[in-house]
Structures are given as structure tokens and as C-alpha cells.
């Protein structure tokens, strides 16, 4: 039996709220019953976004939809599920990604293109779309500007611990807050090609 563990990694630091960003997580039972597996990050109107995606031509449905949506609209929400990557799922996977965006958009009162989907987990299996959609009210009910640590837990799959960083800096008399959360990075090699 192999035992994997994080070595010499610090615990999750305090993650400062970012004005205009609210986060909510829930246990939607997408793959496992006892873990946070659905995250919604709501962005205030006018939020600017940038993204880096895989260079691989064969990419998951959420990557295709996210690229498309970021090219069409300013994001109002990021929708992140763990458990199933919605990769290698063909047109059904595309439909699932689009339907999940439409479901959240209907609740938020925005265009479906303003919702950017992200999925991580097992490849080759479809999302349990009804469980994902049923979990959306739980995420929205848990929304807060301080939900960063919970969101860091909510995006984990095989990660051994949540990862995030936060800094406040003063620039020309204004305090700027930069906060981010991340997953493990092993799957991005070589050169963003997975």
C-alpha cells in the first residue's frame, strides 16, 4: 500500500476577501457523498477575466464551452464541479456543460454565456447533471465574500490539501487584494498540453 502525503507544505493561509467576488460551496454528491464538490464563484458586473487553457486539440467539453463563453460575455459566475471531468464525453458532455451553465444563469438572472464552467475528476464519464443542478441552490445559499477556504476544499480531487494564497498591497493610496486558489499541478505537464 502506498501512502501519499504533502511534505513541507504550509497550511492554508488566511485568504482575504476580494471586493466584488462571492463564493459558495456545497456537497452536491456529484461523486462522493461526504465532500464539497460544487463551487460557484460569483463576479460583480463589470468584472474582467483572463484565462489560460490547454494547448491540446482534444479537450474536455467545459474547456470548449469556457473558451467560447469568455469570448462572448463578461463572466458573472464560475461554475466548478469535482468528481467528473466531463472529458471524452462527446456531444452529450457538451450538452451537459451548456445545460449546467444555463441552469445557473437562470437562477442568477444572467445570460448562459456569462457562466464559465470548469470540471475536474474522472474522465470518460458523464456528469450527473441533475445532482449538479440540484446543488446550485446550496452553493448560492452559502455565498459569502469570505468563502475562499471552503472553495479551495471544494475544487480538490486527489489533492492532499487545499492550496491558496492572498496578498494585500497599496498602490497609489489604494489597497489592492489578490487572492487565488489552486489545484494540484501534475496534470498540466507537458507545457499545458493535457
Where are each of the predicted segments found?
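Generic structural "secondary-structure junction" signal
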Residues: 23-25, 32, 54-55, 65-67, ...
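A generic structural signal for short, solvent-exposed coil/turn residues
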Residues: 15, 30-32, 55-57, 72, ...
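A broad, low-specificity signal marking well-ordered, structured residues that form hydrophobic/aromatic
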Residues: 21, 38, 61, 78, ...
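N-terminal hydrophobic or amphipathic segments with adjacent small-residue motifs
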Residues: 14, 18, 77, 82-84, ...
